[in-house]
């Protein structure tokens, strides 16, 4: 059939293959709430500016509200012949109220319409993501508080480096998620200008009030340049960049969970309700949720790359290529939310095996740095000299198949004759951890203070809980 909305200059209808490649209703119908909100704000502005009558505006708005209820209830029938969410809604509005429906599109284009819809949807998603991240942060805070002095090995190069506390280790992820939340808030501020009223690219000759629409939709202001308004997808790229950084943080934690629950570590035990089994090996208990978070990370990274490649060669202003911006964002947002919830569920159902963590922390000479520091403080060696000396003492312990604190004073004196009995006071992992009192260090007293700061952050954080706060 001939397209009723843009078919005036065409003599034949689009071919089936053209309809198939051109349609976006299969995925952009998710924008129906934003599209209707934008249309209602636009309609109110048209009435205020006397571009359409109050009666016409009432008919249009009532019709849009009916359509929204139909879509929400699942009774609305979408058509691929009508391409996208905008034309599906307008077509059904025309069926309901007649040709007056056509006045809704006065002084606007689908170019500024979709940009407005998409910003509204991304803004709403930021609220959801930030809320989920704060819930995950609270879970991390709870576990850290319960384990502020639980000793575990800290790693570099995945080899035991120095003893730390589990609370301190987990608070590192708390800080990562804080930065993620900050990035979402920054994006909201940067993207919160309204494209509506920019029309196709050049603005419009109608006496519209763009500030009114922006205010109705809770934007900070209208966009400053109509060409930029319809061709800008920086906010899409930034959304996917933020999502990529956030899922990278979750992937790192997921990787540690996978390692920690393995037979080789046995630091933690995952609950049965967040693990799966093997179809052939009955003994298996697999950390599939963590592995899927790690796997979905690549998927979200790919979404960012996809939109960068789409946008890199587009001249101003709008090109149909930009229709390809929706699916990667929808997919990334949904998967990131799922991964945050899965991580929260895993951590809320985790068992900490403290004794195994402590035993591991006591291996591989994890207090060697404490010994090197002691030599500097007490024997007036330079750190380079103490580093060399400590390395020799570690080698001596290796040769004797013992831990550092199991060496005798006489054995140590063969390396450095001036060493004294006091050295043994710093060779235990507990003393090592307790001594790390520099700001941001792993000492339990520091962890307690970090947890207090974390609680204050969560109680004071300004989150975008609803569209009314935007």
Curated annotation (Swiss-Prot):
Endpoints of the signal sequence:
none
- Which reactions does this protein catalyse? 2-(N(omega)-L-arginino)succinate = fumarate + L-arginine
- Record keywords: Amino-acid biosynthesis, Arginine biosynthesis, Cytoplasm, Lyase
Q: Is Amino-acid biosynthesis a UniProt keyword of this protein?
A: yes
Kindly indicate whether the keyword Thylakoid belongs to this entry.
no
GO molecular function of the protein, one example?
Answer: argininosuccinate lyase activity
Instruction: Name a biological process GO annotation.
Output: arginine biosynthetic process via ornithine
Localized where?
Answer: Cytoplasm
Which Gene3D superfamilies does the protein's record reference? Fumarase/aspartase (C-terminal domain), Fumarase/aspartase (Central domain), Fumarase/aspartase (N-terminal domain)
- As recorded in UniProt, its EC number(s) are 4.3.2.1
Q: Name one GO cellular component term.
A: cytosol
Q: Which Pfam families match?
A: ASL_C2, Lyase_1
**Pathway(s) of this molecule:** Amino-acid biosynthesis; L-arginine biosynthesis; L-arginine from L-ornithine and carbamoyl phosphate: step 3/3
Protein family according to the UniProt entry: Belongs to the lyase 1 family. Argininosuccinate lyase subfamily.
Q: Which NCBIfam families match?
A: argH
Q: What is this protein called?
A: Argininosuccinate lyase
Its source organism is: Ehrlichia chaffeensis (strain ATCC CRL-10679 / Arkansas)
């Amino acid at each position: 059939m001939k397209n009723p909305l843009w078919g005036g200059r065409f003599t034949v209808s689009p071919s089936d293959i053209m309809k198939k490649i051109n349609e976006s209703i299969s995925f952009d119908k998710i924008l129906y709430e934003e599209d209707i909100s934008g249309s209602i704000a636009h309609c109110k502005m048209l009435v205020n500016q006397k571009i359409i009558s109050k009666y016409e505006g009432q008919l249009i708005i009532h019709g849009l509200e009916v359509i929204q209820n139909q879509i929400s209830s699942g009774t609305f029938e979408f058509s691929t012949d009508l391409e996208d969410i905008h034309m599906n809604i307008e077509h059904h509005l025309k069926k309901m109220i007649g040709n007056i429906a056509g006045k809704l599109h006065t002084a606007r284009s689908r170019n500024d319409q979709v940009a407005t819809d998409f910003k509204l949807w991304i803004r709403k998603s930021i609220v959801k993501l930030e809320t989920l991240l704060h819930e995950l942060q609270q879970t991390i805070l709870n576990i850290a508080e319960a384990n502020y002095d639980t000793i575990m090995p800290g790693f570099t190069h995945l080899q035991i480096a120095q003893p730390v506390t589990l609370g301190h280790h987990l608070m590192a992820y708390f800080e990562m998620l804080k930065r993620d939340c900050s990035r979402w808030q920054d994006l909201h501020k940067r993207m919160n200008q309204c494209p509506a009223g920019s029309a196709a690219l050049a603005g419009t000759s109608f006496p519209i009030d763009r500030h009114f629409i922006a205010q109705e939709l809770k934007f900070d202001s209208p966009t400053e340049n109509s060409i930029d308004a319809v061709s800008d997808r920086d906010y899409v790229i930034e959304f996917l960049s933020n999502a990529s950084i956030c899922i990278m943080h979750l992937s790192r934690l997921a990787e540690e969970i996978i390692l920690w629950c393995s037979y080789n570590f046995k630091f933690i035990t995952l609950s049965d309700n967040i693990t799966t089994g093997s179809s052939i090996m009955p003994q298996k208990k697999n950390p599939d949720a963590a592995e899927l978070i790690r796997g979905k990370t690549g998927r979200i990274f790919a979404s960012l790359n996809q939109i960068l490649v789409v946008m890199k060669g587009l001249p101003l202003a709008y090109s149909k290529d930009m229709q390809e911006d929706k699916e990667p964002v929808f997919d990334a947002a949904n998967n990131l939310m799922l991964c945050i919830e899965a991580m929260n569920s895993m951590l809320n159902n985790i068992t900490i095996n403290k004794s195994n963590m402590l035993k591991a922390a006591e291996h591989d000479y994890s207090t060697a740095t404490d010994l090197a520091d002691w030599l500097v403080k007490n024997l007036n060696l330079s750190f380079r000299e103490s580093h060399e000396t400590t390395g020799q003492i570690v080698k001596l312990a290796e040769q004797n198949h013992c831990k550092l604190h199991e060496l005798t004073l006489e054995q140590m004196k063969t390396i450095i004759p001036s060493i004294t009995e006091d050295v043994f006071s710093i060779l235990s992992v507990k003393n090592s951890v307790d001594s790390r009192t520099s700001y941001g260090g792993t000492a339990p007293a520091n962890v307690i203070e970090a947890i207090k700061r974390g609680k204050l952050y969560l109680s004071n954080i300004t989150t975008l809980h609803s569209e009314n706060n935007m």
